[in-house]
Regions:
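Active-site-proximal alpha-helix that buttresses catalytic centers in soluble enzyme cores
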Residues: 2-81, 120, 134
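Residue-level preference for the first positions of well-ordered beta-strands
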Residues: 4, 101-103, 139
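Short, glycine/serine-rich, charged loops/turns that create anion-binding
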Residues: 11, 56, 109, 146, ...
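Short, well-ordered alpha-helical microsegments
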Residues: 59-61, 86, 111-112
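Helix-adjacent hinge/juxtasegments
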Residues: 64-104
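A glycine-rich beta-strand to alpha-helix segment
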Residues: 101-119
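Domain-level recognition of soluble alpha/beta enzyme cores
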Residues: 119, 123-157
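Short, solvent-exposed aromatic-acidic interface loops
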Residues: 156-167
């Protein structure tokens, strides 16, 4: 059964004069959270075959911190994950041609909207947590009984929702 991992980038630095939103990196707590998430993903067996990562610096930095602990067969940086809505994210996932599990590193509100839309059922604690909000460096783990190319809203089972300070 393939898994879809939806990861909101870790906590970014505040905007600085002359720095575009796209170019904001992680702050110290964001780096630490992402590194810890990489450790916890490895320990839980949450290892993707494919990573689809927003091209924004904070998303790339998040993946790079996780990648110190978790390896993927293929990593793609996609500009569409910076500006798309949840429906656009779903199209990108379907079109990825992945036969295994996929990690998407992106942004809110798209992550939260997509996690809620895909997860009709799941572990109560995970469902409750994701409905309360999707924090920076939050990770939704959604399991499907079909290939990711065929997923549709309410097809998934939310098996876990990891967030900083509770990992």
């Amino acid at each position: 059964m393939p898994r879809l991992y939806l990861l909101r980038h870790a906590k970014a630095r505040w905007a600085e004069p002359g720095v575009k939103d796209y170019d904001r990196g992680l702050d110290a707590s964001g780096k630490a959270d992402a590194e810890q998430l990489g450790i916890d993903m490895l320990e839980a067996g949450y290892v993707p075959n494919l990573v689809l990562c927003s091209g924004a610096k904070r998303a790339r930095d998040t993946w790079n911190a996780i990648a110190q602990h978790v390896e993927a067969d293929d990593v793609r940086f996609l500009e569409g994950l910076y500006s798309s809505d949840a429906a656009g994210y779903l199209d990108i996932i379907r079109e990825s041609d992945s036969t295994g599990s996929v990690l998407v590193v992106g942004h809110n509100p798209m992550m939260e909207d997509l996690a809620v839309a895909l997860s009709r059922e799941g572990e109560e604690q995970a469902l409750s947590a994701v409905r309360r909000g999707f924090p920076a460096c939050g990770l939704a783990v959604i399991r499907f009984s079909t290939a990711l190319a065929e997923i549709a809203p309410e097809d998934g089972y939310l098996e876990a929702f990891l967030k900083p300070h509770s990992l």
